[in-house]
Amino acid sequence: MSIQIIKQGIMDTLQDKGRYGFQHIGIPPCGYLDYLSAQLANVIVGNPKEAPIFELHFPASSFIFNEAHTICISGANFVPVLNDKSIALNTPIQVCKNDTLHFMQPLLGKTSYLSIKGNIDSSSWLNSKSDFSSQLKTNDQFNIIAWDGDNKINSDKTEEQASHQCNINEIQKHIFNSNEIRFIPGPQWNDLTNESISTILKQPFNTSLNSNRMGYTLKGPSLQLIEQKGYLSSAVT
């Protein structure tokens, strides 16, 4: 096997673009939680942008590589360490046989992605390899197989990939380091007082521990309604 989990994390899974078209019968689409970071990690190693990828949350899983590979880590910064050396995000990294990968602490962000050049060999269901009922466990092993048309898994394009590092850094600077969130006002927006609307637009909020794949719960200044009322639950899109 090409890669093995030597210590499981918390709710780490294998994800791809997800399975759509089955929500009407109660099957969740799953898929990347942070679509942009997952696609970026895949593209950097030369994979199709919607290829399967390891989605990690802190404390994250630890890995051992049984073969040489090209990897990339994107998304949240959990201080990735290859053997005893810290490695950069959004950068193609060459790993050797018996190298180990650990994540030390959550510095920024909630979800990180580990991409490996090649196709992660895992069972597919309804045209997707995304997990929704299981997580990565200690001693899980995965083969990494070449894509059709590739002669070998290991990348020969590290220099070419590195030449695009300036563009990657610009993406990281303008997107991943931004603390601003765009939003579309919903039906309840006009029920808020003017002071509360101003608070939302001007005051900082943090994500709470109650956040999950259905959505983020924010914690910050309290908000007030013009008129106290209750709300029925509504669809999530």
Please provide the spans of the model-predicted regions.
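Conserved "landmark" site that anchors the functional core of diverse proteins
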Residues: 1-237
